[in-house]
Amino acid sequence: MYSSGVDSREKLVEAMAELMWERGYSATSPRAVRELSGVGQGSMYHYFPTKRDLGLAALDHNCRVQLDSWKAALKGLEDPLEILSAYLTLPRDPLKGCRVGRMAQDKAVVADDGLREPVAEAFARLREMLVVVIGAARSQGCLPAGLEPDHLARTMVAVVQGGYVLAMAEQDRAPY
């Protein structure tokens, strides 16, 4: 799965991140991570004494990857409405879910503040980006003056995350 130039720690983080995205944190076993990464048990426990330690690194990785993809997709656009539209219509794999949002559905992640906080922080940063754009659209008269940017940003994120939930529940890409 990985090139020889990737170190063992990075292989473990990337494998755990991928498996967490596919299966969730709770359903991802250290053995599955070792098998996917090709890294031995001794090396895994050298870098990550516990599954939680590896999970934290993988959550940080997934949150960073997701935030970077949101930023990259919106980069270069200047019209606020075009930016908002681009966010809503980003290419997604609805049957796989959001790298970040899937973690908010995992009971073990939600029950552990250390695991939950990177997820909450990623959504907060996304909302902050959207609030700036919504504020610009409102200032330019493209959106009603009475519209609350934070409320609309939260609604937009909820709509996208809800689309993932519907797609997975129905095993249908139609919500996108």
Describe the role of every protein-language-model region.
Residues 102, 147-166:
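Hydrophobic alpha-helical segments that form the core
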Residues 83, 94-114:
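Amphipathic alpha-helical segments used for helix-helix packing
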Residues 8, 51, 58, 62-66, ...:
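Hydrophobic/aromatic residues within well-ordered alpha-helical segments
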Residues 5, 11, 15-53, 57:
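Helix-turn-helix
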Residues 82, 117-122, 139-155, 174-175:
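All-alpha amphipathic helical-bundle segments outside canonical DNA-binding/catalytic cores
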Residues 64-68, 97, 113-139, 151:
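Amphipathic alpha-helical packing segments from all-alpha helical-bundle domains
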Residues 57, 68-97, 149-156:
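Hydrophobic alpha-helical connector segments
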